[in-house]
Amino acid sequence: MPDVEVVTYLHPSWSSLVDDINREPEGTHILVIGYSLGANNSVLVANATNYIDSIIALQPSIFTSNTALTGKVGRFVEIYNPNPWMTFGGMGSQKLIGPNIEYVTNNDTHLGAPFNPEFRNLVKSEIARLSAEPGPEAAPSVPPPPFPSPR
């Protein structure tokens, strides 16, 4: 997929991600994928930006705060394992709080979750979906002239 930029951040650097998102031109499509504590912090990112097209939160952890989503997100999918014993006592068992979150449960161990083909296919389909939508370069840089008034 052309013109797709991928940047990786460690979970404690979520505020740097916010800064980078806020520097993007209006209309740039943003997909945030967070795993474990990064999944939890995807909510903090959404709450500190104007808009995110899509978030995929993979197995958020119960070992940190569970901040409610208040930011604007077009689509938010959370994949988690409700059985804490399969995720090292809850590292992938947190159910995030917020409107319009699509919850998907799985039986993956915490370390095995990123290798799940359903997760990987979801990531690919979201990238393809957002890549197919017009970006900021599709918007005219100068507004069109007004129509002449009828006489």
Residue spans of the language-model regions?
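C-terminal catalytic-base region of ester-bond hydrolases, centering on the histidine
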Residues: 69-151
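Active-site catalytic motif of lipid deacylating hydrolases and related acyltransferases
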Residues: 1-28, 108-113
